[in-house]
Amino acid sequence: MFSKTLVVLAAVAAVTVNGLTKEECDAAFTGEVGKLTKDALPLVQPCSSDSGFSMVPPKGLPTDDQYVKMCASKNCRDLLDVIKKAGLKDCELNFGSVFPGSVPLNVYQLGQGFDAKCASIGGGSTPTTAPPTSTTPTTAPPTGTTPTTAPPAGTTPGVTPSPTTPKPAC
């Protein structure tokens, strides 16, 4: 009896993704892809070129090397932002009917997990800018000496002589 219960639970788990059955996910395929067509489709090819990851047709999840490139790519970051905001269902979308040989891909999880994956592999999902550099170098005076201050540019230290007038020739 216990083993039959386990088999039934395994079967239910195999066809359910976060409360949705495989049939519900398959039925939602066209609508889910439709949510991405307008804004995401123009970014797919540039992201693929930047990263080497094939989202259309999907061959699986990106490798760590592809993730590093995706995290560094503005095209990929923009694409994943569109995916995150699309309101997709948490389903594996089976592209096999459209692209034979492709594998199911959970585009929702790819989008939602992108920032965390970038952080975990050190790719960061947002570009960082270097802090502004100072135009005036600062150095500490050597130990045991009294620091001196240079005069402002264009001035001379000490007493400034008064202007002289030329003396007449003899």
UniProtKB/Swiss-Prot annotation:
<dbReference type="GO" id="GO:0052040">
    <property type="term" value="P:symbiont-mediated perturbation of host programmed cell death"/>
</dbReference>
<feature type="disulfide bond">
    <location>
        <begin position="71"/>
        <end position="118"/>
    </location>
</feature>
<feature type="signal peptide">
    <location>
        <begin position="1"/>
        <end position="19"/>
    </location>
</feature>
<dbReference type="InterPro" id="IPR036470">
    <property type="entry name" value="Elicitin_sf"/>
</dbReference>
<feature type="region of interest" description="Disordered">
    <location>
        <begin position="122"/>
        <end position="170"/>
    </location>
</feature>
<comment type="similarity">
    <text>Belongs to the elicitin family.</text>
</comment>
<dbReference type="Pfam" id="PF00964">
    <property type="entry name" value="Elicitin"/>
</dbReference>
<keyword id="KW-0732">Signal</keyword>
<keyword id="KW-0928">Hypersensitive response elicitation</keyword>
<keyword id="KW-0964">Secreted</keyword>
<feature type="disulfide bond">
    <location>
        <begin position="47"/>
        <end position="76"/>
    </location>
</feature>
<dbReference type="InterPro" id="IPR002200">
    <property type="entry name" value="Elicitin"/>
</dbReference>
<dbReference type="GO" id="GO:0005576">
    <property type="term" value="C:extracellular region"/>
</dbReference>
<keyword id="KW-1015">Disulfide bond</keyword>
<feature type="disulfide bond">
    <location>
        <begin position="25"/>
        <end position="91"/>
    </location>
</feature>
<feature type="compositionally biased region" description="Low complexity">
    <location>
        <begin position="126"/>
        <end position="162"/>
    </location>
</feature>
<comment type="function">
    <text>Induces local and distal defense responses (incompatible hypersensitive reaction) in plants from the solanaceae and cruciferae families. Elicits leaf necrosis and causes the accumulation of pathogenesis-related proteins. Might interact with the lipidic molecules of the plasma membrane.</text>
</comment>
<protein>
    <recommendedName>
        <fullName>Elicitin-like protein 1</fullName>
    </recommendedName>
</protein>
